[in-house]
Design a protein with these regions (language model features):
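A short, conserved alpha-helix within the catalytic core of class I
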Residues: 165-178
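Conserved catalytic loop of SAM-dependent methyltransferase domains
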Residues: 232-258
Length: 280
């Protein structure tokens, strides 16, 4: 049975990133593989004609490369944490239909996928929780979900394309709350500077009728801007296009490598890593 997805629904917003990840897998097979997206799209009844028409455009192909690098970078940080904390909680914040937690599974960690209730309802149908895994419906801004996470073996949290939709004060409150609740844990997420966030926000802010783009979370220098939030934070960052991979692969053109450099340096597209120091 195929799951029908209607246009202009919350479910549709989950399908398009899935399509991007499938496109990455096809265009950049040496750099990125996401078999889950390929499998899930076979189970979905949705009109992909528009996405397919745009899929070979220059910006769509570069956008697919961005998605691939972001997922790879976050998975790298999750695996790095699990090397020292093999029984840790691996927590996907704003998971959608992303299966990074399962892709990083070492056979001992606990996997948590968090998102709004309607998103989790669809996820339960398409990606039911497996062994040592929970799909948790919640609002990330409400810390009530903290109690659902067993962090006795440590905790690594990651958020992909999520915090662009948060106000700076909301991200700050979340980070401060997590620092108290999960000492020794780590949070990794993608971020960009104000210019890039304005570009990202152009479409959805118009529909949401939000005027003050400046209130939304953006970062240029993560260490100097975020460290003052709490003395226990250990903040670092790396460019998200070239910080983990030089992209010297036959599937990536020289022009795309140039755009990647512009993204990392001009737009400050980065993976931010925040370590929560132990209680003082």
């Amino acid at each position: 049975m195929k799951y029908k997805i209607e246009k202009n629904t919350v479910q549709e917003t989950l399908i398009l990133p899935l399509y991007s990840r499938k496109l990455c897998t096809e265009l950049y097979p040496n750099l990125y593989r996401d078999e889950t997206s390929v499998r899930l799209l076979d189970q979905i009844d949705y009109d992909f004609s528009e996405a397919e028409k745009n899929s070979r455009s220059l910006m769509q192909r570069f956008g697919a490369l961005e998605v691939a690098m972001r997922q790879n970078d976050l998975a790298f940080e999750v695996r790095a944490y699990l090397k020292n904390h093999p029984c840790a909680a691996v927590v996907n914040l704003g998971c959608g239909l992303d299966n990074t937690g399962r892709a990083c599974d070492n056979g001992r960690c606990k996997i948590y996928n968090l998102d709004f209730p309607d998103v989790i309802a669809l996820r339960q149908q398409l990606l039911p929780a497996g062994e040592r895994e929970q799909n948790i419906p919640c609002d990330l801004k409400d810390p009530v979900w903290f109690d659902r996470i067993d962090a006795s073996g440590g905790a690594v949290f990651f958020a992909s394309g999520v915090f662009y939709y948060f106000l700076t004060r909301q991200v700050k409150a979340l980070v401060q709350g997590m620092t108290d609740a999960f000492p020794g844990g780590v949070l990794v997420f993608d971020a960009a500077n104000r210019t890039a966030v304005k570009m990202i926000a152009k479409t959805w802010l118009r529909t949401a009728k939000i005027k003050d783009v400046g209130a939304y979370f953006a970062v240029s220098d993560a260490k100097s801007e975020l460290s003052p939030w709490d003395s226990r934070l250990q903040v670092s960052s790396r460019g998200y296009m070239l910080g983990y991979n030089d992209l010297k692969d036959p599937s990536v053109s020289g022009f795309f490598r140039f755009l990647a450099k512009v993204g990392d340096n001009g737009m400050k597209m980065q993976i931010v890593k925040i370590g929560f120091g132990d209680r003082q």
